[in-house]
UniProtKB/Swiss-Prot annotation:
Chain segments annotated as coiled-coil in the UniProt record: none
Region called Domain II, residue ranges: 65-143
Chain positions covered by the region annotation Domain I: 1-64
CDD domains noted in UniProt: UBA_RuvA_C
Summary of the function given for this chain in its UniProt record: The RuvA-RuvB-RuvC complex processes Holliday junction (HJ) DNA during genetic recombination and DNA repair, while the RuvA-RuvB complex plays an important role in the rescue of blocked DNA replication forks via replication fork reversal (RFR). RuvA specifically binds to HJ cruciform DNA, conferring on it an open structure. The RuvB hexamer acts as an ATP-dependent pump, pulling dsDNA into and through the RuvAB complex. HJ branch migration allows RuvC to scan DNA until it finds its consensus sequence, where it cleaves and resolves the cruciform DNA.
Species lineage: Bacteria, Bacillati, Bacillota, Clostridia, Eubacteriales
UniProt subcellular location: Cytoplasm
Name this protein carries in UniProt: Holliday junction branch migration complex subunit RuvA
Organism: Acetivibrio thermocellus (strain ATCC 27405 / DSM 1237 / JCM 9322 / NBRC 103400 / NCIMB 10682 / NRRL B-4536 / VPI 7372)
Family stated for the protein in its record: Belongs to the RuvA family.
Protein's UniProt keywords contain Cytoplasm: yes
Assembly with partners or alone: Homotetramer. Forms an RuvA(8)-RuvB(12)-Holliday junction (HJ) complex. HJ DNA is sandwiched between 2 RuvA tetramers; dsDNA enters through RuvA and exits via RuvB. An RuvB hexamer assembles on each DNA strand where it exits the tetramer. Each RuvB hexamer is contacted by two RuvA subunits (via domain III) on 2 adjacent RuvB subunits; this complex drives branch migration. In the full resolvosome a probable DNA-RuvA(4)-RuvB(12)-RuvC(2) complex forms which resolves the HJ.
């Protein structure tokens, strides 16, 4: 219903914002990361929103970035994960860190979020891993570097490059870093860790 709301920030606490737009005050539930980055009371803000409707509950959720909103929508698509749990995840880890945790089966990182136990974390990974990998691999395949690797190399290499792209590296940067460390006998986590070490060097 609402893609985003732009207006004056009237109030914020650790759970929600109130944004006034055209004389209407919208209560928008959000994450701690959005709360900390949204700005000061009285400033004009833009919040990407999602209208959550279930039986007798209608709530508006919103985030500072489209990336946060995308992860929120992915999370609430998981069986047993509601909007409050999704917000809890986004309060604990960034969207890129979340995507990397899912791709690399990192249950420990997901359970840092309040209310997310091991079983729920495993379910999140099970239900979202292919979706996130497909999104990143599609972007990668459309790049010149991706076309070369996906035609000739293993899926492990492509997945490692995909994980680096989740962290914000370009296809060219990710491909170069992975190619420099890749060996067929490595697992995904080792490839990613070694590639990140290479990227961290000046």
């Amino acid at each position: 219903m609402f893609a985003y709301i732009r207006g004056r920030l009237e109030y914020k606490n650790n759970d929600f914002l109130i944004v006034e737009s055209n004389g209407v005050g919208y209560r928008i539930f959000t994450s701690l990361s959005t709360i900390s980055g949204i700005g000061e009371i009285g400033q004009e803000v833009k919040v990407y929103t999602y209208l959550y409707v279930r039986e007798d509950v209608i709530s508006l959720y919103g985030f500072l970035t489209q990336e946060e909103l995308n992860v929120f929508e992915l999370l609430i698509s998981v069986s047993g994960v509601g909007p409050k749990a999704a917000v809890s995840v986004l309060s604990a880890i960034s969207p890129s860190r979340f995507s990397l945790a899912v791709i690399t089966d990192d249950v420990k990182t997901l359970t840092k979020a309040q209310g997310i136990g091991k079983k729920i974390a495993q379910r999140i990974i099970l239900e979202l891993k292919d979706k996130i990998k497909k999104e990143q691999l599609t972007e990668y395949a459309q790049s010149e570097e991706g076309g070369k690797v996906l035609d000739t190399d293993s899926s492990k290499m492509a997945e490692a490059v995909s994980a680096l792209m989740v962290l914000g590296y370009s296809p060219a940067e990710a491909n170069k870093a992975v190619s420099a460390v890749y060996r067929e006998d490595m697992d995904i986590e080792t490839i990613i860790k070694n590639a990140l070490k290479g990227l961290a060097r000046p």
